Amino acid sequence: MMRSLATAFAFATVIPTPGSATTPMGRGPMTALPVVGAALGALAAAIAWAGAQVFGPSSPLSGMLTVAVLLVVTRGLHIDGVADTADGLGCYGPPQRALAVMRDGSTGPFGVAAVVLVIALQGLAFATLTTVGIAGITLAVLSGRVTAVLVCRRLVPAAHGSTLGSRVAGTQPAPVVAAWLAVLLAVSVPAGPRPWQGPIAVLVAVTAGAALAAHCVHRFGGVTGDVLGSAIELSTTVSAVTLAGLARL
């Protein structure tokens, strides 16, 4: 378990972990990915809090600073998936053509627009959450990683030619998925001003991420690393935006 956790940290962050190079990303590290999400979420909340002290409550600068730190710590891994997936979904043609577009090194207009939208929404939502419930930032980042576990549940195929997809797609048993969803719902209760707001936010977020992944499976023939990254970022964004909106009710 510790080796899987080390691999998950090495895969999803810039943190070097001993022995992680000998363990490829697979079932165990994917199961442990929400732990990495919790750590990243705690870091994001701390940065947002510090930014609010410097720039003032609800300042967009604190939110954008938080997003910037997350991008650095994660090497922009998931946001790159957002760009590639958006370009693939915006491509006409069969799945093979869409996958080729996703593997291309350049970013098209769909990808650029998707990245700008995700970064802007996350930054503004994080800034709002510094005044209405900073724990919601941790919850949002965690929800993205729990969504990744859900996307990799049993019977979900990998897209043809996807190295990461072939290692993680279909690896997560139903009890593991259910356990992480239960944990996410439990920790979401105190994340908002009212106990019902956090659970609603994460349910909407996880559903959005799962729906995107399901559409990508239909469009591309399976899951890729880019699809996982886009599902993570979409769930994180939807959770933060939804909770920021609900918290003002």
UniProtKB/Swiss-Prot annotation:
Q: Where does the record place it?
A: Cell membrane
Q: Which GO terms describe its molecular function?
A: adenosylcobinamide-GDP ribazoletransferase activity; cobalamin 5'-phosphate synthase activity
Main enzyme class: transferase
> Its catalytic activity?
alpha-ribazole + adenosylcob(III)inamide-GDP = adenosylcob(III)alamin + GMP + H(+); alpha-ribazole 5'-phosphate + adenosylcob(III)inamide-GDP = adenosylcob(III)alamin 5'-phosphate + GMP + H(+)
Family of the protein in this entry? Belongs to the CobS family.
Annotated Gene Ontology cellular component terms: plasma membrane
Its record classes its membrane topology as: Multi-pass membrane protein
Entries under InterPro entries matching the protein:
CobS
Q: What transmembrane ranges does the database entry give?
A: 32-52, 109-129, 132-152, 173-193, 198-218
What is its cofactor? Mg(2+)
Q: Which Pfam families match?
A: CobS (PF02654)
Q: What is a biological process (GO) this protein takes part in?
A: cobalamin biosynthetic process
Pathway annotation from the record: Cofactor biosynthesis; adenosylcobalamin biosynthesis; adenosylcobalamin from cob(II)yrinate a,c-diamide: step 7/7
Function noted in UniProt = Joins adenosylcobinamide-GDP and alpha-ribazole to generate adenosylcobalamin (Ado-cobalamin). Also synthesizes adenosylcobalamin 5'-phosphate from adenosylcobinamide-GDP and alpha-ribazole 5'-phosphate.
| PANTHER family attached to this UniProt entry | ADENOSYLCOBINAMIDE-GDP RIBAZOLETRANSFERASE (PTHR34148:SF1)
Keywords from the UniProt entry? Cell membrane, Cobalamin biosynthesis, Magnesium, Membrane, Transferase, Transmembrane, Transmembrane helix
Q: Which species is this record about?
A: Mycobacterium tuberculosis (strain ATCC 25177 / H37Ra)
Name of the featured protein: Adenosylcobinamide-GDP ribazoletransferase
Q: Does the keyword rRNA-binding apply?
A: no
Give its E.C. classification number: 2.7.8.26
